[in-house]
């Protein structure tokens, strides 16, 4: 099978103008913007509700930061247990038992 190397390239990706009419695309974008504005309003309302219940955004951000730090430390601990298990020729499950840890820890 021989192909013409001088033929023009035809992209499999359709350009936005060729995939749908201008009006349909504009309507679709307006609908999407409207839906996003509705979601934003709902989230703003939820934030206001939480703040009225005594929650603060700063406290939430601090909590999220601490959760990220905890998860990173947990990942490092699991990696070290895995390496130790390989060096000892045992399973990590056995190491968890040796150190008095639950598998869910």
UniProtKB/Swiss-Prot annotation:
The superkingdom of the source organism is Eukaryota
List all Low complexity biased stretches. 11-28
Q: Which InterPro entries match?
A: DNA-repair_Swi5 (IPR010760)
Disulphide bonds annotated for this chain are: none
Annotated GO CC locations: nucleus; Swi5-Sfr1 complex
This protein's UniProt keywords? Coiled coil, DNA damage, DNA repair, Nucleus
Q: Where in the cell is it found?
A: Nucleus
**What's a Pfam family this protein contains?**
Swi5
- The chain's coiled-coil residues are 28-54
What is an annotated GO biological process for this record, any one?
Answer: double-strand break repair via homologous recombination
**Chain residue ranges for the region called Disordered:** 1-31
Q: Which family would the database say this protein is a member of?
A: Belongs to the SWI5/SAE3 family.
Function recorded in the entry: Component of the swi5-sfr1 complex, a complex required for double-strand break repair via homologous recombination.
> Subunit composition?
Component of the swi5-sfr1 complex.
UniProt-recorded name of the protein: DNA repair protein SWI5 homolog
Q: Which lineage? A: Eukaryota, Metazoa, Chordata, Craniata, Vertebrata
């Amino acid at each position: 099978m021989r192909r013409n190397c001088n033929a023009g390239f035809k992209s499999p990706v359709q350009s936005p103008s060729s995939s749908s009419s201008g009006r349909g695309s504009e309507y679709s974008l307006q609908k999407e913007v409207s839906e996003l504005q509705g979601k934003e309003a709902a989230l703003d309302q939820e934030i206001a509700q939480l703040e009225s219940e005594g929650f603060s955004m700063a406290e939430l951000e601090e909590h999220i930061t601490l959760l990220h730090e905890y998860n990173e430390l947990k990942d490092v601990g699991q990696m070290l247990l895995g390496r130790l298990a390989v060096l000892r020729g045992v399973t990590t499950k056995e190491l968890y038992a040796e150190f008095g840890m639950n598998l869910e820890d």
